[in-house]
């Protein structure tokens, strides 16, 4: 209560933040008339003046009012758009390295230009991150007009461009691109063999558009570059054939003489836990599998891999549904994004799950891949000196943004008041009743001409609805999110009179729905259908569409604006809010309502018992609906439960990945130092000394030298350095571990000096560089596999009363130290044994090494829950197209040689 009184007096934290920024807005507004009086050239000259002032030590904060005023004026002249006062506040929040929550239609794309312009003046590069290539290209071209007008350069990173184009884009003052492209470029750079081949600059400032989607929804999604393993795929078909013989059971609680008075009994051959998305064999199931596969003990260490694949096959059959979790298209299993409903070709579940689903569907099974390089989005974006983001829905996840990314969320007020009423949820007992009600609602809106956007959570549900509408003769558009550009066009016209659009929840995000339609979009469609029409005819058509859309706009406003119908609640409240946010932009009228049933996944798995009891208590008959605050509260509690569970998963992932991140930093730093030629000889000398220490460990203190393990010492010296060491008996009597170490060190350094004299300093340094990189890359790849295996089994340590996280840290560190020792031993051994006839031999060796590395590369996005290594593309590149290996070279000059 005391806290509420204080809050009433001084305002909430968000209100205090906004209050602090209004004086700066007044200052910017005070400069507007002065800046408006400048010519275009004088305005552009301001950019160079700001850069000089920064070079002389002036801070960005002191420049902010002037820079924002110049950017605002540039927007008016280059784009015909003026930044509102609330957009100036949004720009300040982003510049401070925070998240700006701005409602749909408030102009987030334009807001980003303010901090991007200001920070680009440092010359250190600003990255603007979007969710897909279409938006990256669109925003770089659209906002690029403003930046170029003010004298800055703009680049865009999209799939399919080569390294030279990427390098040029990153060298620009402001670079647009997707989170995937930025992340993969980082991994690719750290697999290259020359610093001049790197495309990225050191990370400075990043503005992440749709920050909740990228930093939260995709946080469990590591980026992976992988290569195929050699394992046979027959095992997946064999195991898949036994699954139909297993009977699904359930868990029952029976009376028992235990502390709780109950005991769990498992029936059938396997049980399924939908909440945890897991399945497991019962004792009867284990016995049946052993009989079907003709093995004695499924839990024998030799058969653990079989047990793992049986469990994955069970999950494939019991938990993963066709046209919901994935689709089968052209003989391939393609994952459906649970948040957007988009197909994700190329993405694969990992750990044998994707192969199990391929076996279930009877399509060709692709080999599992082995990780060559990986990073999570969480760790990638935390490398930026300053990180900020914007979205329409961040406040519900404010705690996670703060705990994981140290990012504060500031809610920016809307430019005009929000007029959209969000009607209470309507709940039915069955899905059939719910769909009947949804169809009636759509029909009513369509008949009076009110545009309707219907949100579904899966492709399957959108197709069911579309089929019913088709049978009833109601014209509609269906968005299954297969093509971003087409998707944006359909969404842009969803506000036309009488339009019915069915879309998976997040499809078309980033595109405003204009009431009455978008005349430019309609004219663009006409231009595509009539490419040879003269320009004056196009202008005439555009003018007609503008008149039509203006008339329809007024009619749609009178009808109540865009009506949103949600057909199911998502696990996250934020996704529901995003759907609602498609309506009521910039003070437009609109409305929203969700239709639910007890058969919906969220209610069935997490909350149906309580809701069902309420409905029974209220004696709800079939066909009747209920609208009640208690029900809405129960649904919100179910959503909060799921959100908390998902937050724990993401937190758990980052705690484990932080261990890996430190190791990645060590390896990548060492690689960069080697590529830069920094202290290569010192690195190698340290490696030699490490191997000397290893061999000298056989010389034991307080034991006569005659009793040392001379066989192991001799084998170690011969294997590592290629020579033998003879010690006379009289010297042996006086030998101590320390004097032996000194003697061995002298001999090894003498042999190395002789090698340098024979090869020459320059060739030797080049050789060390090539062999070090080759060895580091090979050992790092194997280390990543070892870490994957460690992660898979570490949870079992909990049964031994040990903390799995601490055990993981300890063992991962030991694996890392073992890898570093192997890198040293292997590098030294190769240098001492290598024979070079000509300098060209080293160059050939380097070329072959690079070619092999490129051939192995497959670029993957992986969902960490089941997660994935996407498959190699089946499409062959043309000889002059960029090589699909990602090298940045043309195919004919790379893998097509």
Curated annotation (Swiss-Prot):
It is a peripheral membrane protein. ATP binds at residues 87, 105-109, 512. It is an enzyme of class 7 (translocase). May bind 1 zinc ion per subunit. The keyword GTP-binding does not apply. Signal peptide: none annotated. Pfam families: P-loop_SecA (PF21090), SEC-C (PF02810), SecA_DEAD (PF07517), SecA_PP_bind (PF01043), SecA_SW (PF07516). Belongs to the SecA family. It is found in: Cell inner membrane; Cytoplasm. Zn(2+) binds at residues 883, 885, 894-895. It catalyses: ATP + H2O + cellular proteinSide 1 = ADP + phosphate + cellular proteinSide 2. Its cofactor is Zn(2+). GO terms for molecular function: ATP binding; metal ion binding; protein-exporting ATPase activity. Keywords: ATP-binding, Cell inner membrane, Cell membrane, Cytoplasm, Membrane, Metal-binding, Nucleotide-binding, Protein transport, Translocase, Translocation, Transport, Zinc. GO terms for biological process: intracellular protein transmembrane transport; protein import; protein targeting; protein transport by the Sec complex. Monomer and homodimer. Part of the essential Sec protein translocation apparatus which comprises SecA, SecYEG and auxiliary proteins SecDF-YajC and YidC. This is Protein translocase subunit SecA. Its EC number is 7.4.2.8. Residues 846-897 are annotated as: Disordered.
